[in-house]
Structures are given as structure tokens and as C-alpha cells.
UniProtKB/Swiss-Prot annotation:
GO terms for cellular component: nucleoplasm; nucleus. It comes from the Eukaryota. PANTHER family: C2ORF42 HOMOLOG (PTHR13518:SF1), PUTATIVE TREBLE-CLEF ZINC-FINGER C2ORF42 FAMILY MEMBER (PTHR13518). Coiled coil: none annotated. This is Uncharacterized protein C2orf42 homolog. Residues 288-331 are annotated as: Disordered. Residues 312-330 have a biased composition (Polar residues). It comes from Bos taurus.
Length: 574
């Protein structure tokens, strides 16, 4: 009866399979347990023999600590229930709780956490979850740390993006709230952003994924938390403009700033939707040239080649400063073969085309910002003489456009004055337009450039002779974010006596009634034929000593101190 009962349990469609074989299975050489031929290790847990090491992708890191540059502890945690590429943020902190006892009040510190997954936030606000969620538990046991990526200003200048995008990226990169881009996993990065209701911590996740299909071309996908996820694949080409968010450009800049990352993400850098020019990844090699033995031939052929190079550089002149263009021209002749006429070639190649020597508006504005930095010195009083610049009308038009940023219409001057100049050159009747800026953020927005951001405060140290010297505080350097943050977290920085100067704009003290303005004056057509006008910048700055406002004290050594010289002696020669 037993064989018949077994036969009845076999389904009808499996009745003609025949005798069972050992195809697809094999014995473990150690314990004899049958395992599948594709198995990596023995399924007998007490045995644990490893057959081969698979090349499978390592599982995504559960929790990674983000570098914030402060006491804020933020973690990027994987959401297990959604997939390996879905991550959330968890914030850990310490809260103080008082407990009343018979002996008195005891203050204890309790570790607290906040998970920013919508479901966990909703459950926490409603008081449904008594214990910590799984994301907070993963963050508490986290031992991994994110890798900060370097951002180079030269790469940012070479990006084909709007000036507002570059400016925002630079402002985020120079803020002391951690590096701009941090790598969490192979494809996922964390980027700083402006704090909002959706991203209250000021961070968001981005992912770069490339899928290679057998029948189709490689598919490159970029997703940012600031965008809504669209599952329709046919609209991928139409959504390229949407994908070009500021966080996408920040990641691309970080990739291009590192040679290893540039090779790893070369498909995204070379992709048309990246918005980058070919100068992003510079080629260090030089073109092979035939050696020239006479200076006459170098005077004809290299001139033509130089014109071609300069014309090629003109296409990027709106993004690259002239010094980088000239440096690229100089680099092209580094690896030439050494011949007898190399000295003659260098002498003939030093001629410059005057028509190609230009100064961009951002380079000039960077010089204005540097001038303001030099003026804000602790050794002098906070009321310097006005800074005077003679610039073309087009430069002031660009500056006035920056003054009007944030308003729908062009901002009108606070006052317009007509005056007659009789006692100084040039003589005549002129008009003076004056703008009063009373918001320090607007002043920074007007004067900030990628190469020279405006420093609202400047730190100094006092020398033994009473003079003051500029102190470079070890803050976040955009060119070496990884080294800087590693040093800050490992060892606290020893700082001397804090002596600072600060730009006085607006109300800088509680009892101040009228705000201190940052004044911009413009007198057009000082040189009417050349269309050159006169720009005057007036401002004040204050002094801080250990965080408190200090009155200016002139402690400079007097210049009329008598010098003590040794008496002269007479030397006789035989």
C-alpha cells in the first residue's frame, strides 16, 4: 500500500520523468552533503566549506556617517524595505532629562535620534512607536564614514552653466557645514543643498547608475531627491533639462576634479547632457611637432598655429579666465624636442597679440573684492578712504545687474546728484548715482566670485612689536576638502587670541538705530570718448576681540624712533 500511496502523491504531469539523476548537484568533498553546482559554499552550516568566491556585488552599506563640520551627527541609512539604492537621513543627538529623587535632582543625558523617513516621522509624531525604528538602530551602530570629494574652482569655471548656478555651487562649497559632495556607496552620493521643508537637514541623496543592455546602448540614469521620480522611460530625453539640477552639476564638478573619478564616471562626463565642455578633463600630453631649425620658419608657422589655438580658446573665453588660457598656450610647448634653435624659438614665441589680451568682468570684480580684503586690516581704523576704480560702462552695467538680483525690475539708485567740477580735473558737469546696500547678504551676493568670495570677517594675530598679521584659520579649503576634514575631526585646532575685523553693513549692534550702508557711487563718462566712468565704494568695518566688539586703538610703532647706531671707528691701512 505504501508504494501506491506514494505514486498517488506524484502529479500526473511528472509521472513520465524517468529515473532521478545527479544533474545539477554535487557532493561536498568535506561532509558529503548534496549542494547545487552553482552554490558558493556548502549549505551545511556546520561544514561551511567555500567552493568558490563569487563576483557578486557587495551589499550596500547599511549606514554611513556624513561629515558635517560641526557637532551635528547625520547618517545616511539604507531603507531595507525599498531596495539597495533607497536611503534616508537619520539625525542623532543627546538630550538632557531631569529626574527627581529623594537626594535631589539628577540630570542625565539620553541619546536621542530622529528618522526622516516619512512613515517613521508620522509614527513618531503620533506616538505610535515606543522603541527606536530600525533606521536609528542602524545609525547608532554605524562605523563607516562618507568620503568627501574635492571641488576645484578651475573645473567650476570651465562648466557650461549659468553664472547663478556657479555662484550657488561655490557658496555651498565654501560654507563650513561639511564638504559639498560626499560619496556614500559606488553609485550614491550626498550633496549639500539649501535647507527647505523637504530637506530640513540641508543634505540630499543623488545616484549615478549606468545599465548596459545586450540589445540597446548603455543607459545612463541620474536621480536626485530634489526631483520627482518618473518611471516612464520614453521621456528620458525630454527630461534632460530637468535632470540638470544644481546638485547634478556639483557632482559632475567633483568627478572632473579627480582623475580617478573622472575615469570612473567618464560616460557621464562625456555625455551630451552633462553640460560640460571638453576642457573639463585636461590632456597633459602635447601634440607632436616637427623640429624647426631656423627662426624665420618659426615666425610663420607657429604664428598660424597660435592663432588657431587662440581662436579655439575664444570659444571658452566667457568661462575661462585669460590667465588659464595663456597657461594652456604655454603648456603646449613643454615637451618639445631639445634642438639647437630652442632658445631662438622661445625668443620668437614670446610675442603677444595685443588684441587677445583681455580682462573679464569676474576677474576685475575679484580684484575689487581683494582690495576690500586688504582694506579690512586690524591695524587701522574702521573708516577707510573710498576705493576708487576707473572702469568701462559695460563693467558697471554688469555690476548693476548684480545689484538688481532678486528684484523683478532694475534697482534705481537711492540718490542722483548733478555737480560741477571746477577745482580738479576733469572739468565739467557730471552726474553721480548712489546706491545704499544695507543687507550684508546682498553685498556678498554682489561681490562674490568663484575665484575670490567675499570674506565678511578677517582674522589676525598680534605680533610682539604691536603690529598685526593676517591669520589664515584652517577652515574648509575647497581644493582639499578630504584632508582638511580628516584633520579637523582627528585633532582640535589650537587657535591664538581671536582678533577679527568684520564688515559693518546694516544694524550691527542692538542699540543702533540707523543701519550702516555699503555705498556704491558711479560717475559715468569721466572719459567720454573711451566710455570710462568712476566707481567709488565706501564702507566701514569693526573690530572684534575674543568675540566682543572692541574699540580701535592705534598700536602701531612710531616711525620717528631714533635708530641706535654703533660709533664709527677709524681704520688705518699701512
Amino acid at each position: 500500500m505504501e508504494p501506491n500511496s506514494l505514486r498517488t502523491k506524484v502529479p500526473a504531469f511528472l509521472s513520465d520523468l524517468g529515473k532521478a539523476t545527479l544533474r545539477g548537484i554535487r557532493k561536498c568533498p568535506r561532509c558529503g552533503t548534496y549542494n547545487g553546482t552553482r552554490g558558493l559554499s556548502c549549505k551545511n552550516k556546520t561544514c561551511g566549506t567555500i567552493f568558490r568566491y563569487g563576483a557578486r556585488k557587495q551589499p550596500s552599506v547599511e549606514a554611513v556617517k556624513i561629515i558635517t563640520g560641526s557637532d551635528l551627527q547625520v547618517y545616511s541609512v539604507r531603507q531595507r524595505d525599498r531596495g539597495p539604492d533607497y536611503r534616508c537621513f537619520v539625525e542623532l543627538g543627546v538630550s538632557e532629562t531631569t529626574i527627581q529623587t529623594v537626594d535631589g535632582t539628577i540630570i542625565t543625558q539620553l541619546s536621542s535620534g530622529r528618522c526622516y523617513v516619512p512613515s517613521c516621522l508620522k509614527a513618531a509624531t503620533q506616538g505610535v512607536v515606543e522603541n527606536q525604528c530600525q533606521h536609528i538602530k542602524l545609525a547608532v551602530n554605524c562605523q563607516a564614514e562618507a568620503t568627501p570629494l574635492t571641488l576645484k574652482s578651475s573645473v567650476l569655471n570651465a562648466m557650461q552653466a549659468s553664472p547663478e548656478t556657479k555662484q550657488t555651487i561655490w557658496q555651498l562649497a565654501t560654507e563650513p557645514t561639511g564638504p559639498l559632495v560626499q560619496r556614500i556607496t559606488k553609485n550614491i552620493l550626498v550633496v549639500k543643498c539649501k535647507a527647505s521643508q523637504k530637506h530640513s537637514l540641508g543634505y540630499l541623496h543623488t545616484s549615478f547608475v549606468q545599465k548596459i543592455g545586450a540589445k540597446s546602448l548603455p543607459e545612463r540614469r541620474f536621480f536626485c531627491s530634489c526631483q520627482t521620480l518618473k518611471s516612464h522611460k520614453s521621456n528620458a530625453s525630454k527630461d534632460e533639462a530637468v535632470q540638470r539640477c544644481i546638485h547634478f552639476f556639483a557632482c559632475i564638478c567633483a568627478f572632473a576634479s579627480d582623475e580617478t573619478l573622472a575615469q570612473e564616471f567618464s560616460d557621464f562626463l562625456n555625455f551630451d547632457s552633462s553640460g560640460l565642455k571638453e576642457v573639463i578633463v585636461p590632456q597633459l600630453g602635447c601634440h607632436s611637432e616637427s623640429p624647426v631649425s631656423a627662426c624665420e620658419s618659426t615666425a610663420s608657422k607657429p604664428k598660424k598655429r597660435k592663432k588657431e589655438e587662440v581662436s579655439g580658446a575664444q570659444t571658452n573665453s566667457s568661462l575661462l579666465p585669460p590667465d588659464t588660457v595663456s597657461s594652456n598656450l604655454r603648456k603646449s610647448g613643454l615637451k618639445k624636442p631639445v634642438v639647437a634653435s630652442s632658445l631662438k624659438r622661445q625668443a620668437c614665441g614670446q610675442l603677444l597679440d595685443e588684441a587677445q589680451v583681455t580682462l573679464s568682468f569676474q576677474d576685475w570684480l575679484a580684484s575689487v573684492t581683494e582690495r576690500i580684503h586688504q582694506t579690512m586690516h586690524y591695524q587701522f581704523d574702521g573708516k577707510p578712504e573710498p576705493l576708487v576704480f576707473h572702469i568701462p560702462q559695460s563693467f558697471f552695467d554688469a555690476l548693476q545687474q548684480r545689484i538688481s538680483i532678486g528684484s523683478a525690475k532694475k534697482r534705481l539708485p537711492n540718490s542722483t546728484t548733478a555737480f560741477i567740477r571746477k577745482d580738479a580735473l576733469p572739468l565739467g558737469t557730471f552726474s553721480k548715482y548712489t546706491w545704499h546696500i544695507t543687507n550684508i547678504l546682498q553685498v556678498k551676493q554682489i561681490l562674490d566670485t568663484p575665484e575670490m568670495p567675499l570674506e565678511i570677517t578677517r582674522s589676525f594675530i598680534q605680533n610682539r612689536d604691536g603690529t598685526y598679521e593676517l591669520f589664515k584659520c584652517p577652515k574648509v579649503e575647497v581644493e582639499s576638502i578630504a584632508e582638511t576634514y580628516g584633520r579637523i575631526e582627528k585633532q582640535p585646532v589650537l587657535r591664538p587670541l581671536e582678533l577679527k575685523t568684520f564688515l559693518k553693513v546694516g544694524n550691527t549692534s542692538p542699540d543702533q538705530k540707523e543701519p550702516t550702508p555699503f555705498i556704491i557711487e558711479w560717475i559715468p563718462d569721466i572719459l567720454p570718448q573711451s566710455k570710462i566712468g568712476e566707481l567709488r565704494i565706501k564702507f566701514e568695518y569693526g573690530h572684534h576681540r575674543n568675540g566682543h566688539v572692541a574699540e580701535y586703538q592705534d598700536q602701531r610703532p612710531p616711525l620717528d624712533q631714533p635708530l641706535e647706531l654703533a660709533p664709527l671707528t677709524t681704520i688705518t691701512f699701512p
